């Protein structure tokens, strides 16, 4: 099938079309109690499995092979390469209150295979009335945008997906400091 969401009475189609058209995305969310907002999570859940490249790619190939009308299989733009950056903002004065925000925000990019090339945690947002009062943060956002442009203009796939963020983290894939310790040999 097409992999379309069963919910039709909202504006998700606007977000979906913007994503299908985009070569890059910069996604931001406030942090409430360690994590992104519930509304952000709902969008992630709506993208979720229905937009997963591992589902859509084979469904598109099968639809084309069977000579189906494009309206009968997922949007072919689903599998195009994209890059992204993530930004989370919290009012707390310590970074710890944002600890699960960026890891959770990867739920937005992961299903569609969007390569996250930069990310930023802006904490202490309540210390100054407006972000414009933080030249260091404004400069970092300018750099983040430049990283997106660099990735889009890259001549090789390796250079396109290269992580450009300041924080390398423990994980070599998501560059987060979140580490899961499993028991039972996993």
Task: Name each model feature, range by range.
Residues 1, 11, 177-180:
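Secreted/processed peptides and extracellular or luminal domains of membrane proteins
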Residues 1, 23, 172-175:
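Cysteine-centered iron-sulfur cluster-binding motifs in ferredoxin-type domains/subunits
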Residues 1-5, 135-138:
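Charged, often glycine-rich, active-site loop that binds/positions anionic groups
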Residues 99-185:
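Glycine-rich phosphate/pyrophosphate-binding loop and the adjoining helix
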Residues 3-109:
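Helix-loop-strand module that forms the ligand-binding subsite of alpha/beta enzymes
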């Amino acid at each position: 099938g097409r992999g379309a969401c069963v919910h039709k009475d909202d504006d998700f189609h606007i977000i979906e079309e913007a994503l299908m058209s985009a070569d890059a995305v910069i996604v931001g969310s406030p942090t409430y109690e360690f994590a992104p907002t519930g509304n952000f999570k709902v969008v992630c859940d709506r993208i979720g499995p229905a937009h997963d490249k591992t589902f859509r790619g084979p469904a598109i190939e099968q639809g084309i092979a069977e000579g189906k009308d494009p309206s009968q299989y997922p949007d072919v733009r689903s599998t195009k390469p994209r890059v992204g950056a993530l930004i989370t903002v919290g009012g707390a004065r310590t970074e710890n209150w944002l600890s699960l925000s960026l890891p959770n925000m990867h739920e937005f990019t992961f299903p569609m295979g969007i390569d996250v090339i930069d990310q930023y945690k802006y904490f202490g947002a309540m210390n100054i009335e407006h972000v414009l009062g933080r030249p260091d943060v404004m400069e970092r956002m300018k750099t983040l945008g430049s990283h997106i442009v660099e990735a889009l203009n890259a001549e090789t796939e390796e250079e396109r997906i290269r992580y450009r963020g300041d924080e390398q983290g423990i994980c070599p894939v998501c560059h987060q400091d979140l580490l899961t310790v499993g028991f039972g040999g996993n």
